[in-house]
Amino acid sequence: MGKLFGTDGVRGVANKELTCELAFDLGRAGAYVLTETKQKPKILIGKDTRISCDMLEAALCAGLTSVGADVYLAGVITTPAIAHLVKSHGFDAGIMISASHNPYEFNGIKFFNSQGFKLSDQIEEKIEDIILNKKWDEVPHAQFDAIGRINRVELKKDYQEYLKSTLNAASFKGFKIVIDCANGAASAIAPEVFEDLGAEVVVINNQPDGTNINKNCGSTHLQALQEEVVKNKADFGIAYDGDADRTLFVDEEGNTVDGDKIMLLLAQNLKQQGRLKRNTLVVTVMSNMGLFVAAKELGINLEVTKVGDRYVLEKLLEGGYSIGGEQSGHIILLDYATTGDGILTSLQLTKLIRESGKKLSELGKIMKVYPQVLVNAKVENGKKDLYSKDPVILEAIKKVEEKLNGKGRVLIRPSGTEPLIRVMIEGEDYEEIKKDADNLASLIESRLS
């Protein structure tokens, strides 16, 4: 991670940290680095529903066209749709304007290469180097007749058809499903796909107004979905985040089915079909201890990475594996997609539920969830790494670990996208670990404030 790029592109409070000036510079430097050899690169841009997206899109377009790139605006669309469409439609690069699951005041800019993959650290460092060290003399200004043009394109239907093509003509007729679109990019895509496949769909949080994306809804706030599933006597519910790169489920009783359970169910299904490459599932250090126990019982190997879907993807490509993901619902199905795709994952799990003939509550028993507590400590971005050098914090962590005595764990992790340090504790006694996590988070805040 550099000074501009975090674990998921460039992110910050819109118009304060992520300014129009920075978006313009990212457009210029990004187009140059990604398409140096192209005279007239074609770049696809998508956005979610935040109020700041139009402003940042305009600045990006100015930067891109000033170096001669032709821009194609896909409008409001999901992040994984951009990744897919860049490759399927032959664009030279793709850009998504979104801060994913973050509140509306944040926004982000992430790039995809011509194959639909997020950028490597080396490419991001090249872009950063130009911007931070003001190496603009390296970046050409297009001559009058070579300035790029801006075009609007309608590609949503192409993406929806692709999603349906991954299901081998499965039918969801007879299913009643509640879908929470998080007032984000899934609103115009997901409900239509499920309805096309025959499901009866009840949609909530699909009225984006620029400021309500992820607000008490979507995959980070499941309460409304849980209530609607029970009230509507639905078979299950599906939640996405603002840009639909992640998904979580709620069973017919209103219980959460998180990313750990979703990817274990999908991995087990692939294994039964002989399609689980190298018999391996890639997970992160945040996955619940129960997943490790269940995977062993199912005969599935686990590869463990740092938190962040970019690290999951690296491990998938490096090892030649087919599935990996995070507890938060970022799941990468490499046979179908180059990035986490919430709608794709939810379609695959719905197909699995249909073929199993079982209720989701029954399927969810695939693993026993160990009590796990996650508490956020608010710490400025520049101070997030100092916790590991603070003797008082380290001593407090050690004491909690000694108390757990091998029957749990403590994980302290600076967020890659927000000014937070996440304190995660797992153990057998929920009340005890909650108290310890709260105390550790308070200590970290007071020591690093």
From Swiss-Prot:
Cofactor: Mg(2+)
Binding residue positions for Mg(2+): 100, 241, 243, 245
Listed name of the protein: Phosphoglucosamine mutase
Phosphoserine sites (modified residues): 100
Gene: glmM
EC number: 5.4.2.10
Gene3D superfamilies xrefs: Alpha-D-Glucose-1,6-Bisphosphate, subunit A, domain 3, Alpha-D-phosphohexomutase, C-terminal domain
Modifications made to the protein after synthesis: Activated by phosphorylation.
Keyword Isomerase: yes
Record text on cofactor binding: Binds 1 Mg(2+) ion per subunit.
GO CC term (a single one): cytosol
Catalytic activity: alpha-D-glucosamine 1-phosphate = D-glucosamine 6-phosphate
One Gene Ontology term from the biological process aspect of the record: peptidoglycan biosynthetic process
SUPFAM superfamilies for this protein: Phosphoglucomutase, C-terminal domain, Phosphoglucomutase, first 3 domains
Molecular function GO labels: magnesium ion binding; phosphoglucosamine mutase activity; phosphomannomutase activity
Keyword DNA-binding assigned: no
Protein family according to the UniProt entry: Belongs to the phosphohexose mutase family.
